[in-house]
Structures are given as structure tokens and as C-alpha cells.
Amino acid sequence: MKKKLLTLTLLLVLVLAGCVKTKSEVESEGKGDDSKGGVNEKVQIEVLGMGSGEEDLNIVRDQLIKNGFDVKLNIQPDYGTFSAQKDAGNFDLALSSWTTVTGNPDYAVRALFKSDGANSLVDDAKVDELIDQASTETADEYTKTYQQLENQLVTEKAYIAPLYNSFKAQGVNKEVLNPDTVRLAKSRAIAWETIDFKDAAKRTTEPLVSQQAIGDLTSLDPIKGNDGSINTLNTNMYVRLVNLTDEDEVVSDGSLSHNYATAEGNSDYYFLLRDDINFASVSNGKANDTGERVGAEDVVFSLERAKDKDAVPDHRTYSLHERIKSAEIVTDLKELENTKQSGTDETILETLDNGLDTKLSEVVENKTKADNSKGNYQVVKVTTTEPFPQVLNYLAHQSAGIVSEKQVKSINTYDVASFNLDKDIPYGDQRTVTEGANYNNQLYASGPYILVKKNDYQADFVKNPAYRAGSEFEPKISNVTVRFIDDADSALSALRNGEIHLFNGVPETKYDLVEKADNLLLQKSDSNAVTYLQFNTAGREVSKSENLRKAVLFSINQDEFLNYYQGNKKKAYSTVSPLVDTGNELVADSSKVKEFLEAYHKE
């Protein structure tokens, strides 16, 4: 009996000994217990996005899981909550998208990736250097530089993981609108002034009904907004010095300029102004001709405030115009006669004179003295801080829209440093055009239309009676209504039911519904929209480890995105891809994923 008890006691001691960890074992396990996980453990990646991008998020998740990651999706219902999560740093990867609305590659990278960019999470001296270098080069020169930029941004550092380049598509009710008058541009927002009804008799009796997703308008002051809530609206409310064609060529058509010219050295740019546009205002629900001409004084004022980050509180577009050194009115005709046009033997005067009914014989400083029919014109000279040919694209952007110096100064009397949104009402504040007790429309529009009023459901615009009257650019339709429909399926349903005439942004997976509808036409073109994954560059493992970022990068299989979207996407390497053919391509490689993950675990 004693022998049995002794045996049981010994067994119990052995069992207990096996359950107790030694000091060395505890220390050993503690060293391997970090945020990376063990060598054989899966690395967790948190992917942030919105419900509208759930299909993309699911594809990304599946690709990462397939390559050995443990994936957590952080899906937010709207842009506001998405931004809050992003600002709080609650992500490793953020599903992001960017559309280069100016049609030039500098815009595709400066705000996103330069250290001081308004939307940048990247702080890399080499990236900064390459962005600045490319900006001074012409289209014939900058391809190599942008290729080097992509190599640093994606290949070497993996700050982003590209997914695809989208097409641009809109549905048009061809039974109501004349489809030939509806433009679909690669970059710029849709221009309303060219659109016409199939039955021209409806021009003054019925509104053109369009749609946009966001009804909370950032600002109707061009320099205070650069997002989907106002890009189309401000584009149609404020004329600019130049415009973009549907293929992203800079032209003077439909702008405030007859012609423009670039001086030798690519730092001085001259614009010959028209005299047939007045500002419009609103009273009693109607648009009125103020009698105030849109002139060079307003251009200089608008561009000077556009480039000055302290011109207004919450200036959101100054980085687009920071390369402007000055804007001034030309007062000496000899300057135009003695300055050569870049790349030619022509003078600036000869270039500006091209195609005019009445040649330029005198430059005038005061806009009230301009009379183009007599040869008296205003000329504005824009000088950049360094050679910067792409400045013309920025001048075509809605943020370079021309506002009335007199009107804006009369409203913006507050002190910028002590601005208080609760008591100070700045020019372009949406509260002034929103139906209700605070309605007090003080807008002055230089473009083809002016916003009369808005509510939670729509915004109503009226034709500017003093915009290019009698010319081909006079707006065809008198009234435009923009419905606020944030869901793409609901917008498509409204188009199919005839509630709206135009839907810009038809989802790729719904093209067939538009194409099969007897009353609709699908317009489709290339676009500058790129969707990509933005890595968190602060406070996460992906922030510290290039190896981990590269493991994620080579997990991305773009072919699977193209297949899901039935070929209605294209491959991309960065936000530059739609604009410059660098030859770079992302190829998924599971062996590289394994290699970089192993290197990460050894760090």
C-alpha cells in the first residue's frame, strides 16, 4: 500500500512539474510575444473603407488571406465616419480613390504624396524632389521623372498598393435630351451650358434634372472646396481663364479668354480677356444681370487669393496655386510686342491676336474701358515661381474660378485669424442659399449659371442672362435642378424612371441595365480615376516595415479586380497611370510575399 502511495505521489509531482513553466521558458516565450506574432503566426492587417466600396474590400481581404494574412475589415457607412477613423489612425490600409480633375500629372501626386500635401501621409525627401522636378518639365521630358517617382512611391517604399483605373460613364435620357449635346470629359466636371433638350421648345419651360451624391456643400467660394459636393456646381458658376477639352487639352474655348500665350522660359503666361460676360446675382428667385463686367481686376483678385493660404479660413486649394508668384494687368503693349512665344518665332502679341475679329491695338487697365470691337482689350499676366507649364491645367480647375472683387470684399469683412463660424458668414457659405430663416443669397456668378436656392433634396440653378449672350456658349437651358441622391442604385432607378435626365457615375456592374433600356444611352470614356490602398505611415507595424508593406503589395492581384468588373477597369501603378505611360505594372507574386514576410519577422 505504501509502495502504491509513493508511486502515485511521484506521478503527481511529475505531472505538476510538466504544467509549471520554468523561468527560461517564460523569458523565451515573452521574447516571441509581440505585435508581429510568431514566425508561424499570421500577421493581422486592418483594412478601412466605406460600405460603397465593400466589393473591393472583400476582394482585398480574400487576396490577403490567401497569402497568409489575418484580415480585419473596418467598414464605415459614409465618408464622414470613414474620415474620422482615418484621422484616428484606426487602419493599416485605407481604401482610397483619386480623380485628377485638372488633367495633369502634378495634380495627381502633389496633394497626395508630397510631404506638405493637403492629403499626404507620405514624408519622403526623394518623393518630394521628384514631384518638384517633374513639375518644371514639359510633357516631352517628364515621363522618365514620373517613372522614377512611381519606383520610389510603389516599387521601393510601397507607400501605396494600386488596385485599378476606372472608366467614366454616365447615363443619358435620350428621349428627353439631345445626346450629342451632352459632354463626357475625361477630367473636368460636366458642362451644363452645351446641353439641350431634344425638343428645343422646352428650354425655358422645363429644367434639366441632374444628380450628385452629396448635398452638404463645402463652400460656393471656389477656393474653399475641392470635393464632390461642389466641383460640378462651382465649375458651372464661375468662369475661368482657360478650360479643358474632353481629352484634357488646355483651350480658351468657353473661358474668359479669347486666347492665351506662354512666354519663353515657361514662367510667364498671358491671357487676352473677353468683354461679353457680366456677373449675375439673385433676387426674388431670379438671376439678374448686375451690370458689372467680369474683368482683369477680378482675375487678379481671384488668383491672388487662390495662392494665399491665409486669404480665407479653411482654404482648401492653395496648394494647387502656390506656384503662382503674381498676377497682374498688362499696361504696356510693347511688352507683348517684344516677348516671344515659347517654342516659336511668334511674339506674344501675334499669338494673342490669332483669330480675332478685331486685332489688339490697345491694352486697358480698367475693365469698364475695354471694348473688344474697337481693339481695346484687357490682358492678364500670370508669373510662376519657376518654370511650370502645368499651371495652365490648374487655371482650368474650378478653384481658379473668377469671383467679383467688389462683392467678395463687401462680404468677407471678418478677421481671418479670429474667424468664428457661428457668427461670421463668409462668401459662399451654403447657409446663405439654403431655404429657411437664414436664406440671404449673396452669390455673384461669373459663369453660365447661378445657384438660386437649395434644401436637403436638391439645388436649383438659373441661367446667367449676361453670359456670352448670343454666342454658341450661351446656355441653352434656362433652369437646372441637381437632385441629391447618395445611393448609386437609387440614382440609376431615378434615371430609368425619368425622374432625372442625367446620371454621371453609373457603376461598372450596372452598365448593362442602361444599355438595355430603350430610353437611355450609356456614354463611356477613359478617366483619371484611380483606386488604391493607402498605407498608414504612423503608429502601425506597416508604418515601420517596408518588408511588411511589400508583402501586402505583392498580394494584390489586379486581374481579379478586372474580372469582377467584367473588364470595365484597367490596370494602374499609381495615380499618374492614366496620364503618363511609365511602363510600370504590378504583378502579384506569392513567392515575394513569403520572402518579404520572412524578412519582416526577422526585423
Feature-to-residue mapping (PLM):
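Ligand-site clamp/hinge motif
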Residues: D70, A437, A466-L513
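Alpha-helical secondary-structure segments
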Residues: I45-L48, T136-A158, E297, Y377-K381, ...
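N-terminal lobe/hinge region of extracytoplasmic solute-binding protein
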Residues: S210-E264
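Surface-exposed binding/hinge segments that line
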Residues: A311-I425
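Extracytoplasmic/peripheral linker and loop segments enriched in polar/acidic and small residues
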Residues: K72-F82, Y107-V176, T204, K550, ...
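Aromatic- and charge-enriched surface segment that lines or borders ligand/interaction sites
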Residues: N259-L336, K369-A370, G375-K381, V542-K544, ...
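Gly/Pro-rich hinge or "lid" segments in bacterial periplasmic/extracellular proteins
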Residues: S24-E27, G228, T232-T235, D246-E247, ...
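Structural transition elements
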Residues: L5-L6, V20-D33, E137, V176-L177, ...
